[in-house]
Structures are given as C-alpha cells and as structure tokens.
C-alpha cells in the first residue's frame, strides 16, 4: 500500500473515531482496501439522514477512482443510486490525490441539493446497497470447507472473533481431517466474513510463515428456510464419528445439505 494511502487511512480512522463510525472490512495487496464509514448528512427540513458509505480503494488509487456504495434506511434505492453517481462525479475532479474525506464532507454539504433533484424522488423501495451487490432481507446460511488448519488455536480464535463482530451464528466443525464452517446471519455480513477469510493472514504455511487462506470453498449458500434451525450462538465442536456430524446437520434441518455436500468430502 502506498504511503499516501496509509496516511489517508490513519487520518480517516482518527476523524471517524466514535463507536461504529469507522471499520476496515478487508485489506489486500492485490485487491486494495475496503472500509465503511457511518456518518450523517442534512436532508430536507434540516433532518439528519444516516449514511453508510463503503469505499473500495484499489491498489492504484488515487490514480483511479475508488469504488463507492451507499446505504441508508431513509433513502429509496433510486436516491441511493443518484447520490452515488454524484459522488463519483465529484471524485473525478479529485483524481491523483487522497479524496475520501473530501468526498464525505462534500456529501454532507450537498445531500439536500441532490435529493431535491426530480429524478431522486420516485420509488418507495428502501436502499440496501452493500459493498458490491444488493442484499436480500432475512437470514442466510452458508457452508464453507477448509482444507487444513496448521495454526489451529489461533485460527479458531480469529474465526470466533469474526463471527462475533459480524453477529453470525453457527458452527466450526472438526471431524477427522474435515473442517467445516456453517454460518447463519445477514447475507451482507456473510459476504464480509468471506472477504476477511480470504484476505487475512489467518494460518501459517509449511515453513511457519503467516499466510492467507487459499484453500477455502463455499459448498452451499441459501436463504434460511422454515425447516432450518436458527442457531443462537457460534460454537466450535469436534466430532469423533461421521454419524455425530450427520446428527448435527439433521438437528439443524440440513439433512439434504449433509447428503449432497458433506458426504462427498468423506469419499
């Protein structure tokens, strides 16, 4: 990461220092940095509108535009799109220099004007844009498979922390050489978890050097159905036999999932 970008991130962290105002979602030498800022901007009738701004700074930023997404429970989807388009237009005038704080200040000062534009007033569906896609409401469930864990104790603690931070429930399951992570929660948070899992140095390689998880696969993802159990917590569990693992899935209403995806790992 270039030094000016590192400095910009440090400054942003210092500015947005209140609880939940600032959060780094992922860092990668190849994909850049993704972070979230929670702020407010003045709308109609001098009412403050809460905004969730997600920025993706590519590795060649600020020579290129950052990726931007907008989310607000008080704005429609059309309004979110218009706000984003205006923000990107403003970003074009700031190319080649750190711009995130300038963009946040600009949207705080100009949101009311943007919302007064006729094309932003139509539609009643609330805006739920996230880092890269629109999220559906309700709980989702995903099943991940890990090839191995060399630094198991440390790895498990990291997974538990991520699950807690992202308000995800489910199971980290060990059965012989099989390692599965079953997660349940908001789909946006599940995707954030996967970004962390793939971009953070969570394990060590054969020489003991810290490394990223390169051997993870998503076996299954779907919206939670009525027959699925709602997990109340995230737990780490070890099973001595396949039938114990199968019972865990059956109790959770995931018998078909076990048959289609887990059994294939045993063969």
From Swiss-Prot:
Assigned GO CC terms: cytoplasm; nucleus
Predominant location: nucleus
Chain intervals for the UniProt region annotation (Interaction with UBE2I/UBC9): 13-15, 100-102
Cytoplasm among keywords: yes
Cellular localisation: Nucleus; Cytoplasm
Cystine connections: none
Entry comment describing in which tissues the protein is expressed: Isoform 1 and isoform 2 are expressed in glioma tumors (at protein level). Expressed in a wide number of tissues with highest expression in cerebellum, pituitary, heart, kidney, liver, stomach, pancreas, prostate and spleen. Low levels in thalamus, spinal cord, esophagus, thymus, lung and peripheral blood leukocytes. A higher level expression seen in pituitary tumors as compared to the pituitary gland.
Any GO BP: positive regulation of protein sumoylation
PROSITE patterns referenced in this protein's UniProt entry, alphabetically: RWD
Entry keywords, A to Z: Cytoplasm, Nucleus
All copies of domain RWD, residue ranges: 7-114
InterPro entries for this protein: RWD_dom (IPR006575), RWDD3 (IPR038840), UBQ-conjugating_enzyme/RWD (IPR016135)
Induction entry: Induced by hypoxia and heat shock.
Database matches in Pfam families: RWD (PF05773)
Binding partners and assembly: Isoform 1 and isoform 2 interact with UBE2I/UBC9. Isoform 1 shows a greater interaction with NFKBIA and HIF1A as compared to isoform 2. Isoform 2 interacts with NCOA2 and NR3C1.
Function of the molecule: Enhancer of SUMO conjugation. Via its interaction with UBE2I/UBC9, increases SUMO conjugation to proteins by promoting the binding of E1 and E2 enzymes, thioester linkage between SUMO and UBE2I/UBC9 and transfer of SUMO to specific target proteins which include HIF1A, PIAS, NFKBIA, NR3C1 and TOP1. Isoform 1 and isoform 2 positively regulate the NF-kappa-B signaling pathway by enhancing the sumoylation of NF-kappa-B inhibitor alpha (NFKBIA), promoting its stabilization which consequently leads to an increased inhibition of NF-kappa-B transcriptional activity.
Name of the molecule in the record: RWD domain-containing protein 3
Upper taxonomic lineage: Eukaryota, Metazoa, Chordata, Craniata, Vertebrata
Gene coding for it: RWDD3
């Amino acid at each position: 990461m270039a030094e000016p970008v590192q400095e910009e991130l440090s400054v942003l962290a210092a500015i947005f220092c209140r609880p939940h105002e600032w959060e780094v979602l992922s860092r990668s030498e190849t994909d850049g940095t993704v972070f979230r800022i929670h702020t407010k901007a003045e709308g109609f009738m001098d009412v403050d509108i809460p905004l969730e701004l997600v920025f993706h700074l590519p590795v060649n930023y600020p020579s290129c535009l950052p990726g931007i997404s907008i989310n607000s429970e008080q704005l429609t989807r059309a309004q979110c799109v218009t706000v984003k388009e205006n923000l990107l237009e403003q970003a074009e005038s700031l190319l080649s220099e750190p711009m995130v704080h300038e963009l946040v200040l600009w949207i705080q000062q100009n949101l009311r004007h943007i919302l007064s534009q006729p094309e932003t007033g139509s539609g009643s569906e609330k805006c739920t844009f996230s880092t890269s896609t629109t999220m559906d409401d309700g709980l989702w469930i995903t099943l991940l498979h890990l090839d191995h864990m060399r630094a198991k104790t440390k790895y498990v603690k990291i997974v538990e922390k991520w699950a807690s931070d992202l308000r995800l429930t489910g199971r980290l399951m060990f059965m012989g050489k099989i390692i599965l992570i079953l997660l349940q929660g908001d789909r946006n948070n599940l995707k954030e978890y996967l970004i962390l899992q793939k971009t953070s140095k969570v394990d060590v390689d054969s020489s003991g050097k810290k490394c990223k998880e390169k051997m993870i696969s998503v076996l299954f993802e779907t919206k939670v159905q009525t027959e699925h159990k709602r997990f109340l917590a995230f737990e780490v569990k070890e099973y001595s036999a396949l039938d114990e693992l199968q019972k865990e899935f059956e109790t959770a209403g995931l018998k078909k999932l076990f048959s289609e995806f887990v059994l294939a790992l045993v063969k």
